[in-house]
């Protein structure tokens, strides 16, 4: 069993693959938030040669590339394990190399991303501006009003051009209801709560 099957390494590689996928997702999300101006990434090198002042997301792009490499290594580990012959896995050297490389890369990328993330600044004004202009905030009213009523509100809001979403909702539902529903405590709470 010890020389015939390498499935324990495939399992470990699968866990590393899942970690890589999460690092890719987080890094992509941070890149998008930076592009939208909702966060400011720390500069780590000279910016764009054609756009003065631009901060390139090089750390995030580096972490994404590590994730892609770890995913590729996962395929190598699986293929090497599958190609063992009877009682021996002849491809163990390549399997081990890919697995150990993935571990080293993930340790380095996780540390790099963690240190980088601590220096990210939130552009609060931009976030609030985008939130105020987004009819998607009507989603927060689904537990109170139901999906169909919220869909009607979105359609009605989109037919007018004079008011912000919040002003529109206050006219439709009342200021107290809007303030309570859109309060940070309510928005950040888990699940839906029934009102007494």
Region locations from a protein language model:
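Conserved, well-structured ligand/cofactor-binding cores
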Residues: 1-196
């Amino acid at each position: 069993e010890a020389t015939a099957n390498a499935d324990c390494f495939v399992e470990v590689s699968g866990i590393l693959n899942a970690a890589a996928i999460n690092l890719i997702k987080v890094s992509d999300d941070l890149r998008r938030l930076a592009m939208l101006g909702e966060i400011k990434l720390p500069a780590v090198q000279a910016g764009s040669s054609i756009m003065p002042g631009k901060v390139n997301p090089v750390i995030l792009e580096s972490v994404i590339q590590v994730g892609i490499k770890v995913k590729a290594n996962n395929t190598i580990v699986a293929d090497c394990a599958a190609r063992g012959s009877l009682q021996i896995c002849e491809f163990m050297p390549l399997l081990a190399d890919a697995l150990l490389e993935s571990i080293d890369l993930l340790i380095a990328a996780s540390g790099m991303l963690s240190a980088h993330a601590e220096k990210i600044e939130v552009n609060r004004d931009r976030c609030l501006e985008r939130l105020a202009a987004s009819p998607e905030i009507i989603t927060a009213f689904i537990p109170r009003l139901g999906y169909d009523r919220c869909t009607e509100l979105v359609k009605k809001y989109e037919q007018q051009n004079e008011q912000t979403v919040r002003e529109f909702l206050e006219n439709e539902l009342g200021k107290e209801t809007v303030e309570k529903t859109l309060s940070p405590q309510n928005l950040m709470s888990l699940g839906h709560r029934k009102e007494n």
